[in-house]
Amino acid sequence: MASQVVLSFALVVVLAVFVGQVDSCPSDCKCDYRSSQCRPANDDVHPNVCIDHYCVVMNLAKREQRPELSPGAWDDSSEEKDNEASLA
């Protein structure tokens, strides 16, 4: 019996990792992934419905690694961001 509980829990964990996110928000709320807090899904939902609810997000996407700069090399990433901001 105990082994079935452990296996069930392990299956839930594996499925959560496979899906990439565990969302524990009420049905009228959605997960704000930056703050891991639940927010109203639309304007018809009262904010108190979602308060005190949190969601856990596991981001499995790999970020592209930036190459290491040699000492004294110019890092122009902030300049690129400034150019993109001025174009927007």
From Swiss-Prot:
Residues 1-24 form the signal peptide. Residues 66-88 are annotated as: Disordered. GO terms for cellular component: extracellular region. Contains 3 disulfide bonds. Transmembrane segments: none annotated. GO terms for molecular function: toxin activity. It is found in: Secreted. This is U-scoloptoxin(XY)-Er1a.
